[in-house]
Amino acid sequence: MTFSHHHAPARRDVDMTQGSITRHLIQFALPLLAGNVFQQLYNMVDTWVVGNFVSNEAFSAVGTVGPIINMLIGFFMGLSSGAGVVISQYYGAHRPEKVRDTVHTAMVLTLVLCAVFTALGLALIPAMLDLMNTPAEVLPESTAYLSIYFSGITGLLIYNMGSGILRAVGDSRRPFYFLVVSAVLNTGLDLLFVIRFHMGVAGVAWATIIAQAVSAVLVLAVLMRTDSCVRVELRRLRVHWDMLKKIVRVGIPAALQMAVTAFSNVFVQSYINHFGADCMSGWTAYTKIDQLMFLPMQSLALSATTFVGQNLGAGDTPRAQQGVRRALGISLAVTAVLMVPVLLFAPQLTAFFNRKAEVVAYGTLLLRYISPFYLLCCINQIYSGALRGAGNSQVPMVIMLGSFVVFRQIYLYIMSHYITNTLLPLAMGYPAGWLVCSAATLLYYRRAALGRQRLVEDN
């Protein structure tokens, strides 16, 4: 990597087609992991500020809109990954002119989506809240929050797409720096708007979109000043239809998969709610730890996506496959190491979120029964990440939706209606879904030759 001093901004892109596989995977995954942990932390700060300085209704309101926002973020991340895969393959193939076309097409697509989602989002707020059975006392707060959020959604889209472009050429560091700036700013504005100016839920929403706007501006500044092939120039902004087709082919299935997976947890939640408030709180504590357990494998799955993309683009299938095996090995090892303290200290971890004895009992039960199954998740995360890097996101989408949504819903329905309405069999809906998903993904990955799936046409 070359660093230049004053004149041109340094190139931070990383060519993953040469050099140590393990080092590439880990160096790429670490900023992603740190960024994700940071995001979880500032979500927690958001929740803490609202829970302690605004009303109980406000706390529920922010909780209610959570799934809607996660679904949106999932959708954009999937779409950005589509552009990222196309870019990483052309980058690996050393076709800078194609990279340039893809980048500009992706930016035009993003700007169009900004307009569409702002308008649609604002128009559909009542319908969305109605669909989620939002309690009447929470409606005004939820509506206010979403109205502000959708008005400023442009920042979120631009940041996501811009980060996706940078990651495709191996730069996961700068998106991380921008995330940190955004998180710190968000926290500061939260405290200022909510505690100092007493703006309530609206203050939290404003803090979020201002912070996102700043990260979008930072990403754009880098893309417009970089001297690598992903440089964005206003005069080149136009749609290259052949590139758009490729972005959509990978991006839409990935977007649907991420959006629906984010939303399918809402259905599980409704089954958990039957067991009363203590169980709900125990489940909430469990999900917080669950999210942290998932981060290492998710970061490595993204590493695998970029790694496979670049190496297939370069025509080096064996190296791509070796990278996938290595990523799986690392993620299994890291997850196994993380599982030990979770199993040992489950009561203390739950008590960190809620000290009530019944809540701790529920949280401990869930953590101890479900966490050994995280090893299964490594399999489906890494392999579907690898397949997506190869440009095949349709099959992983079908497998994931089949096992996380269809299978899990049928399982929960049959369990709760015909067998037993006790907590553990229902909570096992998660591992059962993971088992089906991992088995199917593994079988498919074994049969599908990675190399046949390149998006890059030979010269």
Language-model segments: what does each one mean?
Residues 1-29, 87-152, 196-252, 308-373, ...:
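Short alpha-helical transmembrane segments in multi-pass integral membrane proteins
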Residues 16-53, 67-82, 86, 111-118, ...:
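N-terminal transmembrane alpha-helices
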Residues 27-46, 148, 159, 182, ...:
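Transmembrane helical elements of multi-pass membrane transporters/channels
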Residues 32, 36, 48, 85, ...:
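Transmembrane alpha-helix boundary and packing residues in multipass membrane permease domains
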Residues 37, 41-59, 129-136, 192-199, ...:
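Helix-terminus/linker motif at the lipid-water interface of multi-pass membrane proteins
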Residues 54-67, 142-146, 205, 277-292, ...:
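Small-residue hotspots at the loop-to-helix junctions and early N-terminal turns
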Residues 59-119, 156-175, 269, 282-346, ...:
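Small-residue-rich hydrophobic transmembrane alpha-helices
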Residues 80, 148-167, 175-183, 204-219, ...:
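Short runs within selected transmembrane alpha-helices of multi-pass transporters and secretion channels
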